[in-house]
């Protein structure tokens, strides 16, 4: 009996399981993908049944609208004028398609379970993230390229109020987010704070200017508004302004914009920038005294204990008769489910009674104020 042997060149040997480094690398990637899938599914499984249905319904409605708009957009061309008109037609339809389901999610999950919202948001973006990313506004919120929510460029997007996106669906989703009551509240609070700054500057003189500090300043849009529309008090040298932020990029951006606007307005003003964190402020305090200290959105991210410690430092740095203004989104924010699920932008919402509990014993007195929508509250504390 004759036995023949067939020799196969090494290059022709199939890459069978366990057969080499590339296969092991493939196994590693596959295992990671399966682990992510399992984690995502387990997060979905903890949701109440109606919440699971609402989440999937939101994704399905977004996908359906995106698919329906594609052919219509191709037929309409790329002229900006029709685009603006088209967004005004599409955005209300998109809003009405998803907001009832978002409201249902809010009722089913509640807001005492942040881990459940994180699980829901993770699953939603695993399934439907490609749709959400068609809106640059939503994409920046969710992906957080600077490592945290509400960075200065994100706030600029809200302040500029432009429907960004390469597709009609993406621009319409941006419009829905920007027109949300939370988006409106952010823009209104800039005007509210501009009023506080103007009032403080009115009591300053060139010899003793009002000293004003913005904590977590971001783009400092409230100062930009004053310089664009009512620069007279700043032109007279009645205010010294200090911007404090943990993000050096935010401070550079704010300084460039404010100095350019001040030059256009002929405003003689002193502007200082301090690059530090709220942790350091809590640990070391602030170098005062200031006639007005305000923080627009920082306290939305602070737990109660940290918020109270930070508030104490702000009030301690006030001059006699000065005011500290602490902003916080109120619990009656109808945009909260959208923030939690689609944008992964959780905040510590607080009621007026919550603010009184945290800061009511500071200074000589406190009032609770609000911007025009009534969604963003402010604790105004007198020294």
Model-based region annotation:
Residues 92-204:
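Conserved Class I S-adenosyl-L-methionine-dependent methyltransferase catalytic core
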Residues 295-298:
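A short beta-strand submotif of the Rossmann-like class I SAM-dependent methyltransferase core
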């Amino acid at each position: 009996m004759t036995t023949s042997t067939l020799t196969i060149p090494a290059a022709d040997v199939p890459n069978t399981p366990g057969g080499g480094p590339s296969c092991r690398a493939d196994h590693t990637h596959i295992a990671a993908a399966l682990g992510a899938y399992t984690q995502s599914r387990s997060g979905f499984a903890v949701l109440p049944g109606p919440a699971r249905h609402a989440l999937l319904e939101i994704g399905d409605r977004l996908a359906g609208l995106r698919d329906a708009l594609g052919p219509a957009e191709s037929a309409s061309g790329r002229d900006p004028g029709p685009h603006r008109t088209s967004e005004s037609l599409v955005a209300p339809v998109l809003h009405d398609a998803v907001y009832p389901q978002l409201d249902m999610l809010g009722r089913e999950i509640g807001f005492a379970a942040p881990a459940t919202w994180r699980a829901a948001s993770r699953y939603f973006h695993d399934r439907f993230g490609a749709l959400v990313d068609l809106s640059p506004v939503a994409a920046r919120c969710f992906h957080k390229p600077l490592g945290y929510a509400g960075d200065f460029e994100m706030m600029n997007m809200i302040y500029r109020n432009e429907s960004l996106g390469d597709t009609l669906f993406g621009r319409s989703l941006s419009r829905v987010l920007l027109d949300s009551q939370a988006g409106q509240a952010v823009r209104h609070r800039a005007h509210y704070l501009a009023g506080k700054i103007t009032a403080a500057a009115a009591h300053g003189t060139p010899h003793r200017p009002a000293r004003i500090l913005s904590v977590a300043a971001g783009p400092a849009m409230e100062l930009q508004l004053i310089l664009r529309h009512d620069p007279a008090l700043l032109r007279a040298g009645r205010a010294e302004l200090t911007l404090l932020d943990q993000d050096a990029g935010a401070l550079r951006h704010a300084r460039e914009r404010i100095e350019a606007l001040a030059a256009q307005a002929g405003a003689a003003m002193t502007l200082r920038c301090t690059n530090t964190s709220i942790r350091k402020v809590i640990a070391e305090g602030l170098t005062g005294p200031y006639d007005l200290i305000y923080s627009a959105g920082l306290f939305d991210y602070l737990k109660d204990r940290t918020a109270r410690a930070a508030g104490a430092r702000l009030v301690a740095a006030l001059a006699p008769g000065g005011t500290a203004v602490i902003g916080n989104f109120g619990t009656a924010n109808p945009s909260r489910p959208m923030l939690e699920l689609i944008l992964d932008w959780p905040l510590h919402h607080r009621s007026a009674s919550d603010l009184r509990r945290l800061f009511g014993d500071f200074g000589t007195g406190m009032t609770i104020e609000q911007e025009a929508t009534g969604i963003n509250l402010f604790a105004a504390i007198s020294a």
